[in-house]
Protein backbone atom coordinates (compact mmCIF):
# COMPACT_ATOMS: atom_id res chain seq x y z
CA UNK A 1 0.00 0.00 0.00
CA UNK A 2 1.51 3.35 -1.09
CA UNK A 3 1.97 6.11 1.43
CA UNK A 4 1.01 9.75 0.81
CA UNK A 5 3.65 12.27 1.68
CA UNK A 6 2.70 15.36 3.66
CA UNK A 7 3.81 17.74 0.85
CA UNK A 8 1.58 15.92 -1.69
CA UNK A 9 -1.39 16.28 0.63
CA UNK A 10 -0.71 19.99 1.09
CA UNK A 11 -0.38 20.45 -2.73
CA UNK A 12 -3.72 18.73 -3.33
CA UNK A 13 -5.40 20.87 -0.67
CA UNK A 14 -3.81 24.03 -2.15
CA UNK A 15 -5.05 23.13 -5.68
CA UNK A 16 -8.54 22.48 -4.39
CA UNK A 17 -8.55 25.83 -2.55
CA UNK A 18 -7.39 27.63 -5.73
CA UNK A 19 -10.03 25.91 -7.85
CA UNK A 20 -12.78 26.61 -5.33
CA UNK A 21 -15.17 29.16 -6.79
CA UNK A 22 -17.31 30.67 -4.10
CA UNK A 23 -20.60 31.59 -5.75
CA UNK A 24 -23.36 32.82 -3.50
CA UNK A 25 -26.79 33.08 -5.09
CA UNK A 26 -29.49 34.80 -3.12
CA UNK A 27 -32.95 33.57 -4.08
CA UNK A 28 -36.07 35.33 -2.87
CA UNK A 29 -38.44 32.50 -1.91
CA UNK A 30 -41.86 32.02 -0.38
CA UNK A 31 -44.53 29.45 0.42
CA UNK A 32 -48.02 29.06 -1.05
CA UNK A 33 -50.64 29.80 1.61
CA UNK A 34 -53.73 29.55 -0.59
CA UNK A 35 -54.47 28.99 -4.28
CA UNK A 36 -57.66 29.09 -6.36
CA UNK A 37 -59.61 31.09 -8.98
CA UNK A 38 -56.37 32.06 -10.74
CA UNK A 39 -55.00 33.75 -7.59
CA UNK A 40 -52.29 32.54 -5.17
CA UNK A 41 -51.42 34.02 -1.78
CA UNK A 42 -47.75 33.65 -0.89
CA UNK A 43 -46.02 33.94 2.49
CA UNK A 44 -42.44 35.25 2.25
CA UNK A 45 -41.08 36.88 -0.94
CA UNK A 46 -40.00 39.84 1.23
CA UNK A 47 -37.92 41.49 -1.51
CA UNK A 48 -40.45 41.09 -4.35
CA UNK A 49 -41.22 44.04 -6.66
CA UNK A 50 -44.67 45.05 -7.91
CA UNK A 51 -45.28 43.41 -11.29
CA UNK A 52 -42.36 40.96 -10.87
CA UNK A 53 -42.67 37.49 -12.39
CA UNK A 54 -42.99 34.68 -9.83
CA UNK A 55 -42.12 31.05 -10.61
CA UNK A 56 -43.94 28.19 -8.89
CA UNK A 57 -42.41 24.79 -8.13
CA UNK A 58 -44.31 23.05 -10.94
CA UNK A 59 -43.41 25.66 -13.58
CA UNK A 60 -46.43 28.01 -13.62
CA UNK A 61 -45.54 31.71 -13.87
CA UNK A 62 -47.47 34.43 -12.05
CA UNK A 63 -47.30 38.21 -11.56
CA UNK A 64 -47.04 39.80 -8.10
CA UNK A 65 -49.80 42.42 -8.04
CA UNK A 66 -50.72 42.84 -4.35
CA UNK A 67 -47.85 43.50 -1.92
CA UNK A 68 -49.37 43.28 1.56
CA UNK A 69 -47.75 43.33 5.01
CA UNK A 70 -48.03 39.58 5.64
CA UNK A 71 -48.50 38.05 2.17
CA UNK A 72 -48.19 38.65 -1.57
CA UNK A 73 -51.17 38.35 -3.98
CA UNK A 74 -50.07 36.69 -7.23
CA UNK A 75 -52.19 36.30 -10.40
CA UNK A 76 -51.45 33.11 -12.35
CA UNK A 77 -50.65 33.01 -16.07
CA UNK A 78 -52.07 29.53 -16.45
CA UNK A 79 -54.65 27.27 -14.79
CA UNK A 80 -52.36 26.48 -11.81
CA UNK A 81 -54.07 23.11 -11.21
CA UNK A 82 -50.83 21.47 -10.03
CA UNK A 83 -49.96 24.15 -7.46
CA UNK A 84 -50.29 22.82 -3.91
CA UNK A 85 -50.62 24.62 -0.60
CA UNK A 86 -47.21 24.70 1.09
CA UNK A 87 -45.22 24.37 -2.16
CA UNK A 88 -42.28 26.72 -2.64
CA UNK A 89 -42.18 29.77 -4.89
CA UNK A 90 -39.30 31.96 -6.07
CA UNK A 91 -39.08 35.49 -7.45
CA UNK A 92 -37.36 35.71 -10.85
CA UNK A 93 -36.13 39.31 -10.64
CA UNK A 94 -37.72 40.01 -14.06
CA UNK A 95 -40.88 41.76 -15.19
CA UNK A 96 -43.07 40.53 -18.05
CA UNK A 97 -41.44 40.80 -21.48
CA UNK A 98 -41.98 39.19 -24.87
CA UNK A 99 -39.76 38.38 -27.86
CA UNK A 100 -40.22 40.71 -30.87
CA UNK A 101 -39.15 40.42 -34.52
CA UNK A 102 -40.31 40.69 -38.15
CA UNK A 103 -41.00 36.93 -38.04
CA UNK A 104 -44.22 37.57 -36.07
CA UNK A 105 -45.92 38.97 -39.22
CA UNK A 106 -48.57 36.60 -40.52
CA UNK A 107 -48.74 34.63 -37.27
CA UNK A 108 -51.41 34.03 -34.59
CA UNK A 109 -49.97 34.22 -31.06
CA UNK A 110 -51.19 34.33 -27.46
CA UNK A 111 -50.57 36.99 -24.78
CA UNK A 112 -47.15 35.49 -23.99
CA UNK A 113 -46.15 35.76 -27.70
CA UNK A 114 -46.22 31.97 -28.11
CA UNK A 115 -47.56 30.79 -31.52
CA UNK A 116 -50.99 29.12 -31.46
CA UNK A 117 -51.42 28.61 -35.21
CA UNK A 118 -49.56 25.27 -35.39
CA UNK A 119 -46.85 26.62 -37.71
CA UNK A 120 -43.84 26.13 -35.44
CA UNK A 121 -41.72 28.41 -33.28
CA UNK A 122 -41.05 32.08 -34.11
CA UNK A 123 -37.39 33.10 -34.19
CA UNK A 124 -36.42 36.37 -32.52
CA UNK A 125 -33.24 37.88 -31.10
CA UNK A 126 -34.78 40.85 -29.30
CA UNK A 127 -37.27 41.21 -26.48
CA UNK A 128 -39.43 44.07 -25.29
CA UNK A 129 -41.17 44.84 -22.00
CA UNK A 130 -44.93 44.26 -22.14
CA UNK A 131 -45.44 47.44 -20.07
CA UNK A 132 -43.35 50.14 -21.77
CA UNK A 133 -43.64 53.85 -20.98
CA UNK A 134 -45.54 55.92 -23.58
CA UNK A 135 -43.56 58.43 -25.71
CA UNK A 136 -43.19 61.83 -24.02
CA UNK A 137 -44.38 65.20 -25.33
CA UNK A 138 -41.07 66.03 -27.07
CA UNK A 139 -41.02 62.60 -28.76
CA UNK A 140 -44.32 63.27 -30.56
CA UNK A 141 -45.60 65.44 -33.37
CA UNK A 142 -49.16 66.30 -34.35
CA UNK A 143 -51.12 63.90 -36.55
CA UNK A 144 -51.16 64.98 -40.20
CA UNK A 145 -51.26 61.87 -42.46
CA UNK A 146 -54.49 60.00 -43.13
CA UNK A 147 -55.01 56.34 -42.27
CA UNK A 148 -57.55 55.32 -44.93
CA UNK A 149 -60.13 52.83 -43.65
CA UNK A 150 -61.74 52.27 -47.06
CA UNK A 151 -65.16 53.17 -45.60
CA UNK A 152 -66.71 56.28 -47.17
CA UNK A 153 -68.58 57.33 -44.01
CA UNK A 154 -65.37 57.33 -41.93
CA UNK A 155 -62.81 58.68 -44.41
CA UNK A 156 -65.06 61.56 -45.49
CA UNK A 157 -66.69 62.63 -42.21
CA UNK A 158 -64.80 61.08 -39.26
CA UNK A 159 -61.24 60.92 -40.66
CA UNK A 160 -58.57 58.94 -38.81
CA UNK A 161 -54.91 60.02 -38.90
CA UNK A 162 -51.76 57.97 -38.39
CA UNK A 163 -50.95 58.16 -34.68
CA UNK A 164 -54.54 58.88 -33.62
CA UNK A 165 -56.67 56.91 -31.13
CA UNK A 166 -60.21 56.48 -32.44
CA UNK A 167 -62.76 54.53 -30.42
CA UNK A 168 -65.25 52.21 -32.16
CA UNK A 169 -68.25 51.94 -29.84
CA UNK A 170 -71.65 50.28 -30.09
CA UNK A 171 -73.91 47.48 -28.89
CA UNK A 172 -73.16 43.84 -29.61
CA UNK A 173 -73.78 42.71 -33.19
CA UNK A 174 -73.64 46.18 -34.76
CA UNK A 175 -70.56 45.60 -36.96
CA UNK A 176 -67.74 46.94 -34.76
CA UNK A 177 -65.32 44.15 -35.67
CA UNK A 178 -66.31 44.49 -39.36
CA UNK A 179 -65.23 48.17 -39.35
CA UNK A 180 -61.90 47.16 -37.77
CA UNK A 181 -61.24 44.24 -40.15
CA UNK A 182 -62.14 46.36 -43.21
CA UNK A 183 -59.59 48.94 -42.02
CA UNK A 184 -56.90 46.23 -41.88
CA UNK A 185 -57.87 44.90 -45.34
CA UNK A 186 -57.57 48.44 -46.73
CA UNK A 187 -53.94 48.76 -45.57
CA UNK A 188 -52.79 46.38 -48.33
CA UNK A 189 -50.01 48.11 -50.25
CA UNK A 190 -50.01 51.09 -47.83
CA UNK A 191 -46.90 49.91 -45.92
CA UNK A 192 -48.78 49.73 -42.60
CA UNK A 193 -48.19 46.88 -40.12
CA UNK A 194 -51.45 45.82 -38.43
CA UNK A 195 -51.95 44.12 -35.06
CA UNK A 196 -55.35 42.65 -34.22
CA UNK A 197 -55.85 41.82 -30.51
CA UNK A 198 -58.82 39.56 -29.72
CA UNK A 199 -59.71 39.65 -26.00
CA UNK A 200 -62.19 37.20 -24.46
CA UNK A 201 -63.90 36.33 -27.74
CA UNK A 202 -65.22 33.00 -28.97
CA UNK A 203 -62.50 30.95 -30.70
CA UNK A 204 -64.84 30.57 -33.71
CA UNK A 205 -65.09 34.39 -34.08
CA UNK A 206 -61.29 34.74 -34.02
CA UNK A 207 -60.93 31.94 -36.59
CA UNK A 208 -63.44 33.74 -38.83
CA UNK A 209 -61.43 37.00 -38.61
CA UNK A 210 -58.17 35.17 -39.43
CA UNK A 211 -59.86 33.52 -42.45
CA UNK A 212 -61.07 36.97 -43.64
CA UNK A 213 -57.48 38.28 -43.42
CA UNK A 214 -56.09 35.26 -45.27
CA UNK A 215 -58.66 35.54 -48.07
CA UNK A 216 -58.02 39.29 -48.41
CA UNK A 217 -54.22 38.81 -48.46
CA UNK A 218 -53.86 40.81 -45.25
CA UNK A 219 -52.05 38.24 -43.07
CA UNK A 220 -48.67 39.06 -44.65
CA UNK A 221 -48.64 42.45 -42.83
CA UNK A 222 -50.79 41.48 -39.81
CA UNK A 223 -50.15 39.90 -36.39
CA UNK A 224 -53.12 38.40 -34.51
CA UNK A 225 -52.87 38.26 -30.70
CA UNK A 226 -55.68 36.09 -29.35
CA UNK A 227 -56.82 35.20 -25.83
CA UNK A 228 -60.23 33.57 -26.14
CA UNK A 229 -63.07 33.42 -23.61
CA UNK A 230 -61.68 30.26 -21.95
CA UNK A 231 -58.27 31.87 -21.24
CA UNK A 232 -57.30 32.85 -17.68
CA UNK A 233 -58.27 36.42 -16.73
CA UNK A 234 -54.57 37.33 -16.32
CA UNK A 235 -53.84 36.54 -19.98
CA UNK A 236 -56.95 38.42 -21.19
CA UNK A 237 -55.70 41.40 -19.16
CA UNK A 238 -52.18 41.14 -20.65
CA UNK A 239 -53.14 40.58 -24.33
CA UNK A 240 -53.58 44.30 -25.29
CA UNK A 241 -50.17 45.18 -23.76
CA UNK A 242 -48.55 42.35 -25.75
CA UNK A 243 -50.11 43.73 -28.96
CA UNK A 244 -48.94 47.26 -28.08
CA UNK A 245 -45.36 46.01 -27.45
CA UNK A 246 -45.28 44.37 -30.90
CA UNK A 247 -46.68 47.50 -32.60
CA UNK A 248 -44.15 49.68 -30.73
CA UNK A 249 -41.28 47.52 -32.00
CA UNK A 250 -42.22 48.46 -35.58
CA UNK A 251 -43.11 52.09 -34.70
CA UNK A 252 -39.62 52.75 -33.29
CA UNK A 253 -38.18 51.28 -36.51
CA UNK A 254 -39.73 54.13 -38.53
CA UNK A 255 -42.72 52.07 -39.68
CA UNK A 256 -46.44 52.88 -39.58
CA UNK A 257 -48.57 50.55 -37.46
CA UNK A 258 -52.23 50.18 -36.64
CA UNK A 259 -53.55 48.23 -33.65
CA UNK A 260 -57.09 47.07 -32.91
CA UNK A 261 -58.16 46.06 -29.39
CA UNK A 262 -61.30 43.92 -29.71
CA UNK A 263 -62.54 44.69 -27.14
CA UNK A 264 -61.50 46.70 -24.07
CA UNK A 265 -64.79 46.01 -22.22
CA UNK A 266 -63.71 42.38 -21.85
CA UNK A 267 -60.22 43.39 -20.73
CA UNK A 268 -61.79 45.61 -18.05
CA UNK A 269 -64.01 42.70 -16.93
CA UNK A 270 -60.96 40.40 -16.68
CA UNK A 271 -59.14 43.05 -14.62
CA UNK A 272 -62.22 43.49 -12.41
CA UNK A 273 -62.28 39.72 -11.80
CA UNK A 274 -58.59 39.71 -10.82
CA UNK A 275 -58.96 42.77 -8.57
CA UNK A 276 -62.00 41.45 -6.70
CA UNK A 277 -60.31 38.07 -6.13
CA UNK A 278 -57.27 39.95 -4.79
CA UNK A 279 -59.70 41.65 -2.35
CA UNK A 280 -59.04 45.13 -3.72
CA UNK A 281 -61.81 47.60 -2.82
CA UNK A 282 -64.46 47.84 -5.58
CA UNK A 283 -65.61 51.17 -7.00
CA UNK A 284 -68.25 52.16 -9.56
CA UNK A 285 -69.86 49.10 -11.27
CA UNK A 286 -67.51 47.00 -9.02
CA UNK A 287 -64.48 47.99 -11.14
CA UNK A 288 -61.31 48.80 -9.17
CA UNK A 289 -60.25 52.41 -8.70
CA UNK A 290 -57.38 52.17 -11.21
CA UNK A 291 -59.41 50.91 -14.18
CA UNK A 292 -58.98 54.31 -15.88
CA UNK A 293 -55.20 53.92 -15.60
CA UNK A 294 -55.53 50.40 -17.04
CA UNK A 295 -56.76 51.87 -20.34
CA UNK A 296 -54.97 55.25 -20.32
CA UNK A 297 -51.49 53.72 -20.03
CA UNK A 298 -52.35 51.37 -22.91
CA UNK A 299 -53.83 53.97 -25.27
CA UNK A 300 -51.20 56.64 -24.54
CA UNK A 301 -48.66 54.34 -26.19
CA UNK A 302 -50.25 55.17 -29.56
CA UNK A 303 -48.39 58.13 -31.08
CA UNK A 304 -47.04 59.88 -34.13
CA UNK A 305 -43.30 60.09 -33.44
CA UNK A 306 -41.22 63.22 -34.09
CA UNK A 307 -38.87 63.48 -37.08
CA UNK A 308 -35.89 62.94 -34.73
CA UNK A 309 -37.28 59.49 -33.86
CA UNK A 310 -38.05 58.61 -37.48
CA UNK A 311 -41.73 59.66 -37.82
CA UNK A 312 -43.07 56.16 -37.17
CA UNK A 313 -46.65 55.92 -35.94
CA UNK A 314 -49.01 53.69 -34.00
CA UNK A 315 -52.73 54.21 -34.59
CA UNK A 316 -55.00 52.65 -31.97
CA UNK A 317 -58.59 51.61 -32.73
CA UNK A 318 -60.00 50.36 -29.43
CA UNK A 319 -63.45 48.74 -29.48
CA UNK A 320 -65.88 49.09 -26.57
CA UNK A 321 -69.22 47.31 -26.28
CA UNK A 322 -72.20 49.18 -24.83
CA UNK A 323 -75.39 47.80 -23.27
CA UNK A 324 -78.56 49.12 -24.98
CA UNK A 325 -76.70 52.11 -26.44
CA UNK A 326 -75.68 53.44 -23.00
CA UNK A 327 -72.51 55.44 -23.68
CA UNK A 328 -72.63 56.99 -20.20
CA UNK A 329 -71.59 53.74 -18.47
CA UNK A 330 -68.22 53.65 -16.68
CA UNK A 331 -65.90 51.99 -19.23
CA UNK A 332 -67.37 53.77 -22.33
CA UNK A 333 -67.01 57.24 -20.71
CA UNK A 334 -63.47 56.42 -19.56
CA UNK A 335 -62.31 55.35 -23.01
CA UNK A 336 -64.17 58.23 -24.76
CA UNK A 337 -62.25 60.68 -22.54
CA UNK A 338 -58.88 59.03 -23.36
CA UNK A 339 -59.32 58.74 -27.15
CA UNK A 340 -59.23 61.39 -29.92
CA UNK A 341 -62.80 60.75 -31.06
CA UNK A 342 -65.31 57.95 -31.45
CA UNK A 343 -67.21 56.13 -34.18
CA UNK A 344 -70.64 55.29 -32.79
CA UNK A 345 -72.43 52.29 -34.30
CA UNK A 346 -76.19 52.21 -33.83
CA UNK A 347 -78.28 49.04 -33.51
CA UNK A 348 -81.31 50.88 -34.99
CA UNK A 349 -79.38 51.84 -38.14
CA UNK A 350 -77.95 48.31 -38.40
CA UNK A 351 -81.44 46.78 -38.20
CA UNK A 352 -82.71 49.30 -40.77
CA UNK A 353 -80.16 47.90 -43.26
CA UNK A 354 -77.76 50.86 -43.13
CA UNK A 355 -74.35 49.20 -42.96
CA UNK A 356 -71.80 50.21 -41.77
CA UNK A 357 -74.29 51.43 -39.12
CA UNK A 358 -72.38 54.61 -38.27
CA UNK A 359 -74.36 57.32 -36.51
CA UNK A 360 -72.70 60.32 -38.17
CA UNK A 361 -74.43 62.83 -35.88
CA UNK A 362 -72.71 61.74 -32.66
CA UNK A 363 -69.51 60.30 -34.13
CA UNK A 364 -66.55 62.66 -34.12
CA UNK A 365 -62.83 62.80 -34.90
CA UNK A 366 -60.92 65.31 -32.78
CA UNK A 367 -58.10 65.37 -35.34
CA UNK A 368 -60.56 66.32 -38.08
CA UNK A 369 -59.53 67.48 -41.53
CA UNK A 370 -55.82 67.45 -40.57
CA UNK A 371 -56.07 63.72 -41.30
CA UNK A 372 -57.51 64.14 -44.82
CA UNK A 373 -55.93 64.71 -48.20
CA UNK A 374 -56.84 68.07 -49.78
CA UNK A 375 -59.06 66.46 -52.44
CA UNK A 376 -61.23 64.82 -49.76
CA UNK A 377 -61.53 68.11 -47.84
CA UNK A 378 -62.65 69.87 -51.04
CA UNK A 379 -65.35 67.30 -51.85
CA UNK A 380 -66.59 66.08 -48.46
CA UNK A 381 -66.51 69.36 -46.55
CA UNK A 382 -70.27 69.89 -46.37
CA UNK A 383 -71.53 66.29 -46.45
CA UNK A 384 -71.57 65.80 -42.65
CA UNK A 385 -73.65 68.96 -42.15
CA UNK A 386 -76.04 67.95 -44.94
CA UNK A 387 -76.56 64.51 -43.41
CA UNK A 388 -77.12 65.94 -39.92
CA UNK A 389 -79.72 68.40 -41.30
CA UNK A 390 -81.37 65.57 -43.25
CA UNK A 391 -81.67 63.39 -40.12
CA UNK A 392 -83.33 66.29 -38.25
CA UNK A 393 -85.65 67.04 -41.17
CA UNK A 394 -86.56 63.37 -41.58
CA UNK A 395 -87.62 63.13 -37.93
CA UNK A 396 -89.73 66.29 -38.34
CA UNK A 397 -91.23 65.15 -41.67
CA UNK A 398 -92.77 62.08 -40.04
CA UNK A 399 -95.34 64.36 -38.39
CA UNK A 400 -95.95 66.69 -41.34
CA UNK A 401 -98.64 65.85 -43.87
CA UNK A 402 -97.79 68.24 -46.74
CA UNK A 403 -94.21 69.33 -47.39
CA UNK A 404 -93.09 72.08 -49.77
CA UNK A 405 -91.02 71.24 -52.84
CA UNK A 406 -87.68 72.44 -51.36
CA UNK A 407 -88.12 70.22 -48.29
CA UNK A 408 -89.05 67.24 -50.46
CA UNK A 409 -85.92 67.81 -52.56
CA UNK A 410 -83.75 68.05 -49.45
CA UNK A 411 -85.21 64.81 -48.11
CA UNK A 412 -84.66 63.06 -51.46
CA UNK A 413 -81.03 64.27 -51.57
CA UNK A 414 -80.45 63.11 -47.97
CA UNK A 415 -81.84 59.64 -48.69
CA UNK A 416 -79.47 59.27 -51.64
CA UNK A 417 -76.51 60.52 -49.60
CA UNK A 418 -77.30 57.92 -46.95
CA UNK A 419 -77.55 55.27 -49.65
CA UNK A 420 -74.09 56.05 -51.07
CA UNK A 421 -72.54 55.57 -47.62
CA UNK A 422 -73.68 51.93 -47.55
CA UNK A 423 -70.91 49.42 -48.19
CA UNK A 424 -70.65 45.65 -48.19
CA UNK A 425 -68.35 43.99 -45.66
CA UNK A 426 -64.75 43.29 -46.77
CA UNK A 427 -65.16 45.70 -49.70
CA UNK A 428 -63.07 48.79 -48.82
CA UNK A 429 -62.82 51.56 -51.44
CA UNK A 430 -59.74 53.44 -52.60
CA UNK A 431 -59.76 57.15 -51.73
CA UNK A 432 -60.13 58.13 -55.44
CA UNK A 433 -63.32 56.03 -55.70
CA UNK A 434 -64.64 57.57 -52.47
CA UNK A 435 -64.10 61.11 -53.79
CA UNK A 436 -65.95 60.28 -57.03
CA UNK A 437 -68.83 58.70 -55.05
CA UNK A 438 -69.26 61.65 -52.66
CA UNK A 439 -69.00 64.24 -55.44
CA UNK A 440 -71.75 62.44 -57.37
CA UNK A 441 -74.08 62.54 -54.35
CA UNK A 442 -73.44 66.04 -53.02
CA UNK A 443 -73.79 67.66 -56.45
CA UNK A 444 -77.24 66.21 -57.11
CA UNK A 445 -76.35 63.76 -59.88
CA UNK A 446 -78.17 60.94 -58.06
CA UNK A 447 -81.42 62.91 -57.65
CA UNK A 448 -82.77 61.63 -60.98
CA UNK A 449 -82.32 57.99 -59.93
CA UNK A 450 -84.54 55.83 -57.75
CA UNK A 451 -83.05 55.03 -54.31
CA UNK A 452 -82.83 51.34 -55.24
CA UNK A 453 -80.73 52.18 -58.32
CA UNK A 454 -78.08 54.26 -56.50
CA UNK A 455 -75.74 51.43 -55.47
CA UNK A 456 -75.81 49.76 -58.89
CA UNK A 457 -75.12 53.09 -60.63
CA UNK A 458 -72.17 53.94 -58.35
CA UNK A 459 -70.55 50.53 -58.90
CA UNK A 460 -70.88 51.11 -62.67
CA UNK A 461 -69.48 54.65 -62.37
CA UNK A 462 -66.39 53.49 -60.46
CA UNK A 463 -65.71 50.77 -63.05
CA UNK A 464 -66.27 53.28 -65.89
CA UNK A 465 -63.80 55.76 -64.32
CA UNK A 466 -61.11 53.08 -63.97
CA UNK A 467 -61.49 51.86 -67.55
CA UNK A 468 -62.37 55.01 -69.53
CA UNK A 469 -60.95 57.88 -67.44
CA UNK A 470 -57.78 56.53 -65.76
CA UNK A 471 -56.31 60.05 -65.78
CA UNK A 472 -58.79 61.06 -63.02
CA UNK A 473 -57.24 58.58 -60.59
CA UNK A 474 -53.71 59.49 -61.73
CA UNK A 475 -54.29 63.20 -60.95
CA UNK A 476 -55.69 62.46 -57.48
CA UNK A 477 -53.01 59.94 -56.51
CA UNK A 478 -50.14 62.17 -57.69
CA UNK A 479 -51.31 65.64 -56.57
CA UNK A 480 -53.81 64.73 -53.77
CA UNK A 481 -55.82 67.75 -55.00
CA UNK A 482 -59.22 67.77 -56.70
CA UNK A 483 -58.09 69.94 -59.63
CA UNK A 484 -60.33 71.54 -62.26
CA UNK A 485 -59.12 68.96 -64.77
CA UNK A 486 -60.08 66.11 -62.39
CA UNK A 487 -63.50 67.70 -61.82
CA UNK A 488 -64.09 68.03 -65.59
CA UNK A 489 -63.12 64.38 -66.16
CA UNK A 490 -65.42 63.26 -63.35
CA UNK A 491 -68.35 65.36 -64.61
CA UNK A 492 -67.97 63.90 -68.10
CA UNK A 493 -67.82 60.36 -66.71
CA UNK A 494 -70.95 60.92 -64.57
CA UNK A 495 -72.95 62.38 -67.49
CA UNK A 496 -71.92 59.56 -69.83
CA UNK A 497 -72.59 56.87 -67.21
CA UNK A 498 -76.04 58.33 -66.30
CA UNK A 499 -77.13 58.30 -69.96
CA UNK A 500 -75.82 54.75 -70.38
CA UNK A 501 -77.37 53.58 -67.10
CA UNK A 502 -80.85 55.03 -67.78
CA UNK A 503 -80.78 53.50 -71.26
CA UNK A 504 -79.92 50.07 -69.80
CA UNK A 505 -82.63 50.37 -67.14
CA UNK A 506 -85.30 51.15 -69.76
CA UNK A 507 -84.43 48.14 -71.94
UniProtKB/Swiss-Prot annotation:
It is found in: Plastid, Chloroplast thylakoid membrane. PROSITE patterns: ATPASE_ALPHA_BETA (PS00152). It is an enzyme of class 7 (translocase). Keywords: ATP synthesis, ATP-binding, CF(1), Chloroplast, Hydrogen ion transport, Ion transport, Membrane, Nucleotide-binding, Plastid, Thylakoid, Translocase, Transport. It is a peripheral membrane protein. The keyword Mitochondrion does not apply. One of its GO terms (molecular function) is ADP binding. ATP binds at residues 170-177. Pfam families: ATP-synt_ab (PF00006), ATP-synt_ab_C (PF00306), ATP-synt_ab_N (PF02874). Its EC number is 7.1.2.2. It catalyses: ATP + H2O + 4 H(+)(in) = ADP + phosphate + 5 H(+)(out). One of its GO terms (cellular component) is proton-transporting ATP synthase complex. The record marks 363 as: Required for activity. Signal peptide: none annotated. Belongs to the ATPase alpha/beta chains family. Produces ATP from ADP in the presence of a proton gradient across the membrane. The alpha chain is a regulatory subunit. F-type ATPases have 2 components, CF(1) - the catalytic core - and CF(0) - the membrane proton channel. CF(1) has five subunits: alpha(3), beta(3), gamma(1), delta(1), epsilon(1). CF(0) has four main subunits: a, b, b' and c. This is ATP synthase subunit alpha, chloroplastic. It comes from Phalaenopsis aphrodite subsp. formosana. The gene is atpA.
Amino acid sequence: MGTLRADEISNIIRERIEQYNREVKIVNTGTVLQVGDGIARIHGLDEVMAGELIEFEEGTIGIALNLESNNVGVVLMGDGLMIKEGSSVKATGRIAQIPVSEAFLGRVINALAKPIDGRGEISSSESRLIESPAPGIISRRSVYEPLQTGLIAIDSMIPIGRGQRELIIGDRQTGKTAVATDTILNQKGQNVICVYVAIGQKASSVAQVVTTFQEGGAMEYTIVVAETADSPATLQYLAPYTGAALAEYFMYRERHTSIIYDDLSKQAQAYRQMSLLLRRPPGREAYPGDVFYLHSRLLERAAKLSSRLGEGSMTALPIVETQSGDVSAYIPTNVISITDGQIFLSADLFNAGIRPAINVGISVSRVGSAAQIKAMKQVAGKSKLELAQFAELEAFAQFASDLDKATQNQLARGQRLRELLKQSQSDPLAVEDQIATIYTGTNGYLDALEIGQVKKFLVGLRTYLTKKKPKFQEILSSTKIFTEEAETLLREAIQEQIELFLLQEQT
